[in-house]
Amino acid sequence: MNKSKRSFRRRLPPIRSGETINYRNISLLRRFISEQGKILSRRMNRLTSKQQRLITVAIKRARISAPSPFLNNESRSSTNY
């Protein structure tokens, strides 16, 4: 009944300390949006609840003000329709 020792590797936080959550920061927001344009869950993002709320509000603002579209056009251009 020996328990195998697995090496524990600490993951890097998805949002670095210098990054601000802002609706104009599209490169940050795209990391938290799926290929279908959906906001990824907090468990998949490994965010705190406060960070997830701020990300959600920023994505919704970006969709309305149009820096970020509702659907990700990059995934659509890679497949031929």
Swiss-Prot record:
TM spans, by residue? none
Extract the signal peptide range: none
Tell me where it mainly resides: plastid
Q: Does the keyword Chloroplast apply?
A: yes
**Superkingdom of this protein's organism:** Eukaryota
A GO term from the CC aspect: mitochondrial small ribosomal subunit
Which InterPro entries does the entry mention? Ribosomal_bS18, Ribosomal_bS18_CS, Ribosomal_bS18_sf
Q: Which NCBIfam families match?
A: S18
Similarity section? Belongs to the bacterial ribosomal protein bS18 family.
Q: What is this protein called?
A: Small ribosomal subunit protein bS18c
